[in-house]
């Protein structure tokens, strides 16, 4: 309600000022309802879109696990490196995909925020150097006779993914314990850090990760095909015979 005195002053203003005031008031009142409606629409749309991606990821994950188990008893070391790299990546992408819809559209603000934090944590902790250091990857390329063109494609994919990784580290540099592990002794600071997490910045990081992920998904199967050719398998086998 507008106090009577303020209402009188408002009505004394020029008509454009009055119109603007009522427009702002209407936006403030309707905004929560508009946002809620948009989230419902977005949730339905994303759930439909992500269903196909989720099924594809699950299938790829199951196949990769099955093949890697077979390879672990073989002497094809380069193929092991590439399949292990694939599994490492697929697990991270599956985690992000599992919370993506909730991060963007869950009706509960806290659950949206929690999903955002999980996405950031996955990208923050995701470190390709752990599973495939540059020297190990280079050796695998050489042993499997991977073409220079495919090596460059992989390098570009890694560059984009590492860029997202760096951004995630920046966003969580001073707030990781509060936003994820709840280790900060200052509970109010912890609460403010969690609730003030920038959703748009988080989604930009995720978008950057997916940009690299798309390149990676295109390049890695081609690398694995080359590594699985007769010529490559014979070369790998002879190195460890």
Predicted regions and their residues:
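Long, charged low-complexity segments
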Residues: 174-181
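Amphipathic alpha-helical interface segments
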Residues: 1-171, 191-241
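Carbohydrate-active enzymes and regulators
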Residues: 184
């Amino acid at each position: 309600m507008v106090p009577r005195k303020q209402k009188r002053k408002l009505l004394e203003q020029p008509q454009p000022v009055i119109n603007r005031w009522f427009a702002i008031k209407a936006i403030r009142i309707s905004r929560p309802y508009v946002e809620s409606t948009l989230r419902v629409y977005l949730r339905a749309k994303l759930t439909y879109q992500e269903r196909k991606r989720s099924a594809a990821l699950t299938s790829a994950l199951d196949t990769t696990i099955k093949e890697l188990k077979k390879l672990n008893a073989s002497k094809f070391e380069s193929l092991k490196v590439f399949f292990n790299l694939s599994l490492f990546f697929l697990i991270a992408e599956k985690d992000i995909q599992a919370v993506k819809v909730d991060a963007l559209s869950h009706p509960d603000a806290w659950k949206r925020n929690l999903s955002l934090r999980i996405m950031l944590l996955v990208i923050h902790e995701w470190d390709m150097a752990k599973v495939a250091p540059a020297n190990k990857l280079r050796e695998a390329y050489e042993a499997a006779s991977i073409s220079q063109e495919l090596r460059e494609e992989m390098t570009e994919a890694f560059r984009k993914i590492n860029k997202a990784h760096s951004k995630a580290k920046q966003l969580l540099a001073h707030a990781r314990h509060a936003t994820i592990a709840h280790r900060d002794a200052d509970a109010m600071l912890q609460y403010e850090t969690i609730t003030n997490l920038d959703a748009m910045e988080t989604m930009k990081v995720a978008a950057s990760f997916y940009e690299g992920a798309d390149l990676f998904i295109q390049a890695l199967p081609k690398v694995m095909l080359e590594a699985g050719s007769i010529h490559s398998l014979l070369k790998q086998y002879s190195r460890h015979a």
